[in-house]
UniProtKB/Swiss-Prot annotation:
Protein name: Eukaryotic translation initiation factor 6
Signal peptide from the UniProt entry: none
Subcellular location: Cytoplasm; Nucleus, Nucleolus
One Gene Ontology molecular-function label: translation initiation factor activity
NCBIfam families named among the record's database cross-references: eIF-6 (TIGR00323)
Assembly, per entry: Monomer. Associates with the 60S ribosomal subunit.
The entry's keywords: Cytoplasm, Initiation factor, Nucleus, Protein biosynthesis, Ribosome biogenesis
Organism for this UniProt entry: Danio rerio (Zebrafish)
CDD domains referenced in this protein's UniProt entry, alphabetically: IF6
UniProt xrefs under PANTHER family: TRANSLATION INITIATION FACTOR 6 (PTHR10784)
Domain of life: Eukaryota
Family named by the database record: Belongs to the eIF-6 family.
């Protein structure tokens, strides 16, 4: 299921929301309509949390997370941290990170198993990322862009990357992530994929400008038409990975 939405007439909804398989963060303020779009699709399966990070509403660009954990920058206030921690499921760890590249969502892209990071990300941040989110970390670029968190979006089912990503790069990234990738756009031609959409294993939200062609590509590569929130697939994949490692 792919749904269109906008935040105060802004189509870059990936800046104002962070979606994983176990929780969703939505920026405070804004119209109740934006929040209710997420609430309507997700409320039966996960908490939808109003939040700010470091006093900012662009929470999607400030943090990075998956079903195991959430990393936020060091300038996140104690109140913000406590509020998010209280609302998250008990199994999800939240961790503050001292990192020069503090817009973590721009420099890290991840699913529940693998993370792509900016080539200059601090070594300590990489270790915290691997430990808290339980992912394998690769330093990569996407279409020669170092802001990997901005120019791709991927789930455990598939991924969308910058339209100018070469076939060779797509193949390399796909083999690292172990999911199929497609080069494409959102919001009627925008190559800043992660700013224009958020996605998990069964649901995607895109900016209002996203065309029906872009939506059908998204539904296809992320396999949204065939999946429902399911603990079974996750458990099967976890046990398969355990048996391979």
């Amino acid at each position: 299921m792919a749904v269109r939405a906008s935040f105060e007439k802004n189509n870059e909804i990936g800046c104002f929301a962070k979606l994983t398989n176990t929780y969703c963060l939505v920026a405070i303020g804004g119209s109740e309509n934006f929040y209710s779009v997420f609430e309507g699709e997700l409320s039966e399966t996960m908490p939808v949390i109003h939040a700010s990070i470091a006093g900012c509403r662009i929470i999607g660009r400030m943090c990075v997370g998956n079903r195991h954990g959430l990393l936020v920058p060091n300038n996140t206030t104690d109140q913000e941290l406590q509020h998010i921690r209280n609302c998250l499921p008990d199994s999800v760890r939240i961790q503050r990170v001292e990192e020069r590249l503090s817009a973590l969502g721009n420099v890290i892209a991840c699913n529940d198993y693998v993370a792509l990071v900016h080539p200059d990300l601090d070594r300590e941040t990489e270790e915290i990322l691997a430990d808290t989110l339980k992912v394998e970390v690769f330093r990569q670029t996407v279409a020669e862009q170092v802001l990997v968190g901005s120019y791709c979006a991927f789930s455990n089912q598939g991924g969308l990357v910058h339209a100018k990503t070469s076939i060779e790069d797509q193949d390399e990234l796909s083999s690292l992530l172990q999911v199929p990738l497609v080069a494409g756009t959102v919001n009627r031609g925008s190559e800043v994929i992660a700013a224009g959409m958020v996605v998990n294993d069964w649901c995607a939200f895109c900016g209002l400008d996203t065309t029906s062609t872009e939506l059908s590509v998204i539904e296809s590569v992320f396999r949204l038409s065939e999946t429902q929130p399911s603990a079974i697939a996750t458990t099967m994949r976890d046990s398969l990975i355990d048996s391979l490692t």
